């Protein structure tokens, strides 16, 4: 009997170790994807700002600080302390919703250059990768159904033909919000991955 219990313990430990290794592998892949998107967002935003006159930059930045990104309607941690207290599944679910919210707006960021054309396919890969992590980390006590993602309306002027000044503002808004949201996702995935490593220090 003791030998049977010992064998079961060894088998259980082996399965648990395999799950941890697979989780770490999936997290590493998604971390690489979101890092690439965040760096790309920073570069595109920086390039766009560099193309503006100083006064245009000042005015657009002033307007942006008064506006909200569409994704601000997605409930997420308000600071680093709340982020660190959030469960792995909660951080993954919020990350999924943030990425999903860019599925359509990202199309207007594509075109014109090779880096821009990477945005939509990279977002799709990241979305699928996060979904795999959600499914791998779900349990009976905390389940986020696939249809729980908040359906956000597109940006107010997304489908409209705009004048030069309005088009400039929309592009600035999209790039700034995209950069902001990719930074959020990168932070949440970093904390979630760290949470699965008991010996790690997950302080932001």
UniProtKB/Swiss-Prot annotation:
Picking any one GO molecular function of the record gives: metal ion binding
The GO cellular component terms are: extracellular space
Extract the CDD domains matched here.
somatotropin_like
Q: List the disulfide bonds.
A: 69-177, 194-202
Location(s), subcellular: Secreted
Coiled-coil blocks: none
Q: What does this protein do?
A: Growth hormone plays an important role in growth control and is involved in the regulation of several anabolic processes. Implicated as an osmoregulatory substance important for seawater adaptation.
Family, as annotated: Belongs to the somatotropin/prolactin family.
Q: What is this protein called?
A: Somatotropin
Per the UniProt entry, what species is this protein from, by scientific name?
Answer: Larimichthys crocea
User: What lineage does UniProt assign to this protein's organism?
Assistant: Eukaryota, Metazoa, Chordata, Craniata, Vertebrata
